[in-house]
């Protein structure tokens, strides 16, 4: 393991009897994939430290890309996990992402309605806009801009793989540091991917308001936002 076994305890944002929300670090896959190297590290390796007295560790209620940071929801037991899976599948969970892009969209706010499909390219795959793809909708607004960069708030209304990354790239504003859909100059390679799951609203109860959780942006994003004149609460 590349981290201490209990390092996620310091990244715990929310805890109750049904779920946990953690601040996922960038650069660590949430689970081992089919193309993962044997023995490669992933976030699930550290869930045992998050039992908090439960007989089994929590499990993923949804996923974030390896290079995305921020709010990640875990179910603490099978019944809770089923409920969370339904909420995500039905689009009931409201997700807000922050992105810093290389390039500024022509329209400073809007809705991107562009279907997406996974395409095999050579030895790998990527997601592309395709007429016969799955429906994918993202709303966005530019919060700040300067030096050829834009600070964008994006809200996916659907949950397709790489959705925000592909949608913003389609506007001529790929996410800074995106290793797959970005314009990776030598300078860009110095940055981790600037996509952060900033806030999540989860309507767990029918009688109470949704649970709101926010994750602080990583230091590299804060540094760029400061250059753009953005103050973080």
Enumerate the language-model features and the residues they cover.
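Pseudouridine synthases involved in rRNA/tRNA modification
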Residues: 1-18, 28, 157, 165-233
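RNA pseudouridine synthases
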Residues: 1-126, 130-137, 144-145, 216-232
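Loop/turn elements at beta-strand to alpha-helix junctions within RNA-recognition modules
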Residues: 78, 157-158
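Short histidine-centered loop motifs in beta-beta connectors
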Residues: 147-155
């Amino acid at each position: 393991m590349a981290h201490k076994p209990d390092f996620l305890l310091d990244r715990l944002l929310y805890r109750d009897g049904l779920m946990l929300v953690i601040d996922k670090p960038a650069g660590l896959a949430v689970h081992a994939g089919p193309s993962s190297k044997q023995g490669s590290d992933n976030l699930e390796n550290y869930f045992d430290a998050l039992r908090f007295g439960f007989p089994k560790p929590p499990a993923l209620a949804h996923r974030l890309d390896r290079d995305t940071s921020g709010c990640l929801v875990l179910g603490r037991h099978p019944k809770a996990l089923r409920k969370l899976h339904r909420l995500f599948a039905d689009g009931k969970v409201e997700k807000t992402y922050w992105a810093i892009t290389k390039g500024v969209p022509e329209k400073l706010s809007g809705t991107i309605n562009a279907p997406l499909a996974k395409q095999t390219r050579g030895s790998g795959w990527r997601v592309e806009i395709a007429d016969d793809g799955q429906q994918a909708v993202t709303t966005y607004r530019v919060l700040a801009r300067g030096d050829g960069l834009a600070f964008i708030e994006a809200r996916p209304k659907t949950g397709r793989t790489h959705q925000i990354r592909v949608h913003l790239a389609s506007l001529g504003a790929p996410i800074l540091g995106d290793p797959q859909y970005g314009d990776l100059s030598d300078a860009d390679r110095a940055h981790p991917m600037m996509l952060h799951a900033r806030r999540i609203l989860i309507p767990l109860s029918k009688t109470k308001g949704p649970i709101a959780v926010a994750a602080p942006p990583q230091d590299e994003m804060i540094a760029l936002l400061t250059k753009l004149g953005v103050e973080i609460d």
